[in-house]
């Protein structure tokens, strides 16, 4: 025994052998899942195996909001700017989320660009081989098309490059905490000072 921990006393009574959890089905379950993935890939051909295209979103809360991840679906505004009708989007492998709202121009533009890149690479098979409609791909593109396995257009988190500066005498003399306190005080008294200045100006005019 080490450290100030509780001395373990195993409470093995009440026919504990009957309550032992076993995992003997794990290898077979792994095989079943693999076979199911292969069957699904054949069934949804020529669509990508990893499902529809998802937008790039920031995680919620202070802990995760600096990280980007895949969201549920593109907003109606993003689809509108990209020039894709909202009824057409789910039929060509683009997920739509009518609840999500765009709260920044940067996020909107990045997802619109993502949609445009996807649309440029997209190969659309006709519903019926003999009836080719507007928007369907050419026979040459259809002949060369392959099913995308795994993730496509992966979301990569880009880290901002830090710029190193030389430490000068001014930087060494700068008191960061004092500066923060001063600015906080100025912000707190800003309203009262502005009011006092306005009253003084009014007195001068008299």
From Swiss-Prot:
Composition-biased stretches, type Basic and acidic residues, lie in 196-206
- Has the keyword Ribosomal protein been applied to this entry? yes
Q: Where is region (Disordered) located? A: 186-206
Q: Does the keyword Transcription regulation apply?
A: no
Q: Which UniProt keywords apply?
A: Ribonucleoprotein, Ribosomal protein
Output the Gene Ontology cellular-component terms: cytosolic large ribosomal subunit; cytosolic ribosome; plastid
Q: Which GO terms describe its biological process?
A: translation
**Which residues, if any, are the signal sequence?**
none
Listed GO MF terms: structural constituent of ribosome
List the PANTHER family hit by this protein, alphabetically: 60S RIBOSOMAL PROTEIN L13 (PTHR11722), LARGE RIBOSOMAL SUBUNIT PROTEIN EL13 (PTHR11722:SF0)
Q: Which family does it belong to?
A: Belongs to the eukaryotic ribosomal protein eL13 family.
Query: What is the official name of this protein in its record?
Result: Large ribosomal subunit protein eL13x
Q: What is the protein's species of origin?
A: Arabidopsis thaliana
Source species taxonomy: Eukaryota, Viridiplantae, Streptophyta, Embryophyta, Tracheophyta
């Amino acid at each position: 025994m080490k450290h100030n921990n509780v001395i373990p006393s195993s409470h093995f009574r009440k026919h504990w052998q009957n309550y032992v959890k076993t995992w003997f089905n794990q290898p077979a379950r792994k095989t079943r899942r693999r076979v199911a993935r292969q069957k699904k890939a054949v069934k949804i051909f020529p669509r990508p195996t990893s499902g529809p295209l998802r937008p790039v979103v920031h995680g919620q809360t202070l802990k995760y909001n600096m990280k980007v991840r895949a969201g549920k679906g593109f907003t109606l505004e993003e689809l509108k700017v990209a020039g894709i009708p909202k009824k057409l989007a789910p039929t060509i492998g683009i997920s739509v989320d009518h609840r999500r709202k765009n709260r920044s121009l940067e996020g909107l533009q990045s997802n619109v660009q993502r949609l445009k890149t996807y649309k440029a690479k997209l190969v659309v098979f006709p519903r019926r081989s003999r009836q080719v409609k507007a928007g369907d791909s050419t026979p040459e593109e259809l002949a060369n098309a392959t099913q995308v396995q795994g993730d496509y257009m992966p979301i990569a988190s880009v880290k901002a490059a830090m710029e190193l500066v030389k430490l000068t005498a001014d930087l060494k003399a700068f008191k960061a905490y004092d500066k923060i306190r001063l600015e906080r005080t100025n912000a707190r008294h800003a309203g009262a000072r502005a009011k006092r200045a306005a009253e003084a100006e009014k007195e001068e005019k008299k």
